[in-house]
Amino acid sequence: LVIPSKFTYSMIKPAFGSCYGLIKYKWFSKLQFKSLRIKSNLFDEYYKDTCAIRKSDMIAFLQENSVYSLKDGIGECEATVQIYVGEKEKQSMKKSAKIIHEKLQDSFIQVLPNMYHGEFSINHADDYVRKLLEIVNRR
């Protein structure tokens, strides 16, 4: 996400401050997990990892993510960059992918049919690794 949102930034601390404790409850974590559309067999690992994140770290991570923007010099990048975005992702994520693609001259963008955010690398890990190996082997 490369579209900063000051409003989102300002809402993260009060929202997570008031409901952070809920992540320790499995019923709540299952609701979160379901919304992420991750394979069900990964829930135990997700729950363990989520419970290990300190409140201050979670807030800091989410706040920084909400105000991230591309640096002015990004256009000077000489790397060939692959950009994957799910067809079913939020518009802000699709727009961010397009912005990155437009700023990077040698970038390639692919919209992945019927996929949500993170689904390619998590739920289709074999395909994701195969794609990475193709990229590495082309060098």
Description of each model-found segment:
Residues L1-L22:
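Flexible "cap/lid" loop of the alpha/beta hydrolase fold
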Residues D44-K71:
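Hydrophobic, aromatic-rich cap/lid helix
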Residues I74-E78, E102-Q105:
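Short, conserved loop/helix-junction motifs that constitute active-site signature segments
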Residues E76-C77, I83-V85:
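Short beta-strand/loop motif that positions the catalytic acidic residue
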Residues K90-S96:
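Conserved alpha/beta-hydrolase "acid-adjacent" motif
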Residues L112-V129:
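Catalytic histidine-centered segment of alpha/beta-hydrolase-like enzymes
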Residues D127, K131-R139:
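C-terminal alpha-helix
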